[in-house]
């Protein structure tokens, strides 16, 4: 009798455990709750930043709004830094991450990625007087970037040991460090550099070299396969329907280029 009860308790425990760890934030849960929580950049124009009226605006914000509209649920925007994106998803603080996130094998160990929804490349940007043609020319220079970002991962691999890499907590601080000449080189996304140039036409900034082509993907927690499938259908539908192209034209000033599907 004792053995039977023991088995019953163990079986019950694992059943509850499995339900509690796999059902959280999947498609059916989002629909039943009537709300989707989506992480967006807290300060990374033009993808996500505080607008003139105090609300969050940007490419990723518009995509998040479109996701909620097509799900037919309320949207809760959760502004995050680069370092917060994956932890917030893993701990169920958000259901999706739409925050200029590139996909790589290391990140794919922790979360799932959708097909790409936005164009992006990472590069090194600096004043015209600096002769920089590749990573080796960064030797002895101060390079500013956002800690935990894709640029951080990539430049750390290829920069000479004498490069002084200065990591900042968010993109706003990184960009400010470059414009105030705290660093010699800005390592960031092309859109961030373009935004700086647009804000100040007199700013001396050039693309020195491309570090990596890195389109943006939507992050989905592992185990939420129905939600991932829905997101991929959503992206395909909005590519074909022109909605993503309209968002690209609005925020990046360019047509949506061909993007990889996963």
Language model region names:
Residues 73-76, 83, 101-105, 115-162:
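A conserved helix-loop-strand patch within extracytoplasmic ligand-binding domains
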Residues 61, 76-87, 166-180, 212-214:
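Short helix-initiation/N-cap motifs at beta->coil->alpha
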Residues 42, 118-126, 194-236, 254-262:
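Periplasmic-binding protein-like
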Residues 61-70, 136, 141-142, 149-150, ...:
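Extended ligand-binding regions for polar small-molecule ligands
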Residues 25-100:
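Extracytoplasmic small-molecule ligand-binding "clamshell" domains
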Residues 36-37, 72-74, 91-99, 141-142, ...:
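Alpha-to-beta junction loops
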Residues 150-167, 204-207, 236-262:
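Ligand-binding clefts/hinges and TM-proximal coupling segments of bilobed small-molecule sensing domains
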Residues 84-87, 101-109, 154-157, 179, ...:
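A ligand-binding cleft/hinge motif common to bilobed small-molecule-binding domains
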